[in-house]
Amino acid sequence: MAAPILKDVVAYVEVWSSNGTENYSKTFTTQLVDMGAKVSKTFNKQVTHVIFKDGYQSTWDKARKRGVKLVSVLWVEKCRTAGAHIDESLFPAANTNEHLPSLIKKKRKCMQPKDFNFKTPENDKRFQKKFEKMAKELQRQKTSLDDDVPILLFESNGSLTYSPTIKINSSHHSAMEKRLQEMKEKRENLSPTSSQMIQQSHDNPSNSLCEAPLNISHDTLCSDESIAGGLHSSFDDLCGNSECGNQERKLGGSINDTKSDMCISSLVLKTNNTHLSPSFAHLDKSSPQKFLSNLSKEEINLQRNIVGKIVTPDQKQAAGMSQETFEEKYRLSPTLSSTKGHLLIHSRPRSSSVKRKRVSYGFHSPPKEKCKRKRSIRRSIMPRLQLCRSEGSLQCMAGPALEALGCGESSYDDYFSPDNLKERNSENLPPKSQLPSNPAQFSCRSLSKKERTSIFEMSDFSCVGKKPRTVDITSFTAKTICSPQKTASGEGCATFSCVTSEESSAPEETLRYCRQAGPQQKEDAWPEGNGFSYTIEDPSLPKGHDGDLTPFEGILEEVKEAVGLKSTQDKGTTSKISNSSEGEAPSEHEPRSVVDCNVERSAEEKENLPGGYSGSVKNRPTRRDVLDGSCDSFKDLIKPHEELKKSGKGKKPTRTLVMTSMPSEKQNVVIQVVDKLKGFSIARDVCETTTHVLSGKPLRTLNVLLGIARGCWVLSYDWVLWSLESGQWISEEPFELSNHFPAAPLCRRECHLSAGPYRGTLFADQPVMFVSPASSPPVAKLCELVHLCGGRVSQVPRQASIVIGPYSGKKKATVKYLSEKWVLDSITQHKVCASENYLLPQ
């Protein structure tokens, strides 16, 4: 440490860099302390010296007002080197901003990092006060609790202790605790209020309790937590003759000319409180679901013969009551068809507090016989359920989920299991608004590769290119195949039907296959021989359209927009859609439906795509025979995009853009705008593909001259900014630098009018030139400029009549030795300048 030569000095240091971004006060503070001076962190009354450089104006004014000595940093340095207290008047401080107007306040921002000290109650008073306040509040809350109020506390080991202040016995249970215990003992459904308790009906003692809960909520329709179960309902339940076990759902109506004791195995669709069309009740089928299948062989026969055939109780008893697993292809019957008359299915709007519902349906089987629950892990695509009628009308007023029977197992345990967490959370959602006329589109999670392949294997693209129509394939089984004559008479199962454009007033339907989550609709067809319906949705079916069903014939026609390529179309492989029997003209079949396919699937998936499922009902060709054409045409449309993907991210734009005389900040802006608006690729130098040259400043650079010679647009930087503002590339003419470069618009017009590759004619009449190796710009660029303007360049000087640039060899009297500026000025002005002004000294 140096001698205390400045022991009587109390200094305040304010030393900044000239631009106000760096604070150097710490360095001089250390030097002053070493010399024995005291350094104050604030400008107080004890301060005797102010070391000032480019500091605040307020500090300068305060020092002048108090008469404190203002010295520069040179005074500190001189004292240190001399080892003595130097006179302050020799090194006065200077204030460069003293005479500047005070209206402009210069903001200072020190870029140096500060020392970070972690705040603790010990070193931070504010933090200490906050900490003490929180501790007092916590203590007050603990002492304010009454001793007789039971509370819940979590112990250190994670266990839950109930009311530690009072020993709990059976008499101190809360009302909710008693309610939970009662429901567990009685195996009742959980509900927070007594008004929603399930009232079991015991009118028919012969009915066995065969239940399996099914609650597919709005949220779980698109999740992996969906579960399904075997569904059992009696004919009496459907007719409203006996009450269901669950009062939340009521089934009523009448079916004429049938027996009241006939049992029907059916699905009950519970959707939102919405009036659907008379023909369909749609269900989101895009989610993989786990189905619980417990139907017997007899029930399968009932379900497959539900239309046009009456099964008596005697026949049912003869079929046997042995329970067996419902095979995968019989997972859920997508059709509930009525024979004659009217069938009404009503459902109350689902309240947010209803957790799980159980319904017991009568079925003639031993009373103690129970259904076994079994969860299937296989993911599948749920078809949209449809309620088809042959001679009557069908109404479906439903809530947001499929509902089935509760199983004999404990609903209490099911409710609190982790598997049902999503299901319980989704039930708190508010009811959806009324559906529009076209089917609702549900958001779904992104599909895996296996699911996308499964969807395409079972998709029918036959309706693409047609106007809105409905194709109903109901109860199409392997054992019982109904003929079109039965369909027309209303006794058989509904076959392929098509509503022509004259009959259907519904809005167009967009079939989409999308990889990411979003509004989407997907077609689905069951595997061959499954005996189930396949629906291409249309929101409505005309009321008068009972038995007059038109055969549907058609295959894929246009999928060119499916992969986003408008120009890709294989006319040889695409198949035309035949007209319906109503006599529609081909011109009426405009391609209004689009299958939006994700083109990022692997080539293996595309090769494995079978065709869609379509064909004439009368001829009944096999599905694979009918759909080879649609499959091939779809593959051909996808192949070009697949090749693009293999070769890279697509073909780069053929136009290039060159920047010149532009700082890096503007260059970054241009690059970002080009990335956003597309259409250009950035090049460093002007080349054959360059069409635009952007100049940050109107300077004559090589790129500008090359751009003029090639007939490019020479534009200002503002063109990019205005294009970004408009969201697209705008007209270039208002931003052309024609004032600074008159030749630019002239060469550009000549380039546009030229039939072949453009080459200027500026130097076409000039003799052969030789460009000196010592010329500037470089020889190669200068030769290129001369060539582009129609001139001829020789490699040796003896063949040339004009020598461009400094030449050190033997000079001839017949040869003109001109400066490089002659070429540059001639190109800029688009005329051959007088050579006398550019002669080099001999």
UniProtKB/Swiss-Prot annotation:
Subcellular location: Cytoplasm, Cytoskeleton, Microtubule organizing center, Centrosome
Biased composition (Basic residues): 346-359
Annotated Gene Ontology cellular component terms: centrosome; cytoplasm
Single GO biological process annotation from the record: cerebral cortex development
Keywords noted in UniProt: Cytoplasm, Cytoskeleton, Phosphoprotein, Repeat
Polar residues: bias regions: 434-443, 566-582
CDD domains in UniProt: BRCT_microcephalin_rpt1, BRCT_microcephalin_rpt2, BRCT_microcephalin_rpt3
Bias (Basic and acidic residues) ranges: 586-608
BRCT domain residues: 1-93, 647-737, 758-840
Modified-residue entries (Phosphothreonine), positions: T335
Domain of life: Eukaryota
Residues where Phosphoserine is found: S279, S287, S296, S333
InterPro entries per record: BRCT_dom, BRCT_dom_sf, Microcephalin-like, Microcephalin_mammal
Pfam families: Microcephalin, PTCB-BRCT
Function, as annotated: Implicated in chromosome condensation and DNA damage induced cellular responses. May play a role in neurogenesis and regulation of the size of the cerebral cortex.
PANTHER family: MICROCEPHALIN
Subunit structure: Interacts with CDC27 and maybe other components of the APC/C complex. Interacts with histone variant H2AX under DNA damage conditions.
Protein name: Microcephalin
Originating organism: Macaca fascicularis (Crab-eating macaque)
Lineage, top ranks: Eukaryota, Metazoa, Chordata, Craniata, Vertebrata
